[in-house]
């Protein structure tokens, strides 16, 4: 079984949107924070000097992914976009997987 990044684009876009509007409660409610405390995520984003914006389609052309056979997941590394910079040097690391025909993502690192 292999997973394709295209399966997860809508849910990744939604996750980045919630980050861009500082809605960490939604991320936690959906269990997308993985082992990361949403308070820690919020603090990192708060101290980043630029404003995160929703991911454009171009971000997914630049994403790197790797299928992890043991976990049956797709680890994805995708650049954030900011209002000031466009493509940012800050990356989002996610683990993407399927559960009962639903696509799910959770933050890595």
Q: Could you describe each region identified by the protein language model?
A:
Residues 1-4, 32, 43-46:
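Eukaryotic low-complexity, non-globular regulatory regions
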Residues 1-17:
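Short, low-complexity N-terminal intrinsically disordered segments enriched in polar/charged residues
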Residues 6, 10, 22, 89:
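Short, well-structured alpha-helical interface segments that form or flank functional binding sites
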Residues 15-19, 34, 58:
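Central antiparallel beta-sheet cores of small beta-barrel/beta-sandwich binding domains
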Residues 21-34:
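Short, well-ordered alpha-helical segments enriched in acidic and aromatic residues
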Residues 45-89:
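Surface-exposed, charged secondary-structure patches
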Residues 87-109:
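Short beta-strand edge/turn micro-motifs at domain boundaries
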């Amino acid at each position: 079984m292999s997973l394709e990044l295209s399966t997860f684009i809508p849910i990744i876009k939604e996750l980045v949107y919630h980050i861009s509007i500082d809605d960490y409660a939604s991320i936690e409610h959906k269990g997308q924070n993985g082992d990361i405390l949403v308070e820690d995520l919020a603090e990192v984003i708060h101290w980043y000097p630029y404003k995160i914006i929703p991911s454009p389609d171009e971000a997914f052309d630049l994403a790197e992914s790797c299928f992890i056979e043991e976990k049956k997941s797709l680890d994805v590394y995708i650049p954030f976009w900011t209002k000031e910079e466009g493509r940012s040097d800050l990356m989002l690391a996610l683990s993407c997987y399927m559960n009962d025909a639903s696509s799910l993502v959770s933050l890595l690192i």
